[in-house]
Amino acid sequence: MELSDYFRILRTRGWIIVVVAVVAAVSAFGASRAQRPIYKSSMQVTVLPARNDMGLAQTTKQLLRAYVTIMDTKNWAQQVLDRLAQDGHPQDMTPEQLKNNVIIASYEDKNVIQIDAKDGAGEQANRIAWLWAQEFETWRNLENGKVRKEDQVDVKLGDYPTYAKFRPQTTINTAAGGIFGALLGALIVAALEWIESGLVRTPADVERNLGLAVLGVIPTSER
């Protein structure tokens, strides 16, 4: 196809691409606005050995994974639910449901454990992440009381968390819908052009398809 053919297609069928893209973008925007917003709050906890000893520091790094396993349990979630109820913020969910809304990960190079809590209310997500970390601090202090001071592992809580919207990402979804719609519209246009590629409408079509020069054209009859 020549460049002029592409311009002809855009001129005659470009509206299809635009319409499909707009419809897809509007649909994605509407679907995003209809979703219940979910907020995420992240809390960081730093785990520090009591003495600057290479052996204890290495052990602490290994313990980080164990701490994550201990915190990522239904029993731990129940403790957080109890704390929420005591603070006047009871949750209508089971420990399993709360546990599924919390992701705990360790970063051994920084001696940090990160707690990500998701909830339909931003402030509640903050409280869950904060209390989850506080429970860990309390448990770690109790464990420290069982060992010598030089063998203790201290816990330092980060700043009180601040929530952010986790989903829906309305802007991203709308843009993705528009791009998908434009691609779909382009496929529709390509299909229409392929279907009609065998039709001959003008002398130029004859020359392009058959490679023959048109010597004359039979005029249409008028009645």
Where are these predicted regions, by residue range?
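Hydrophobic and amphipathic membrane-targeting/association helices
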Residues: M1-R223
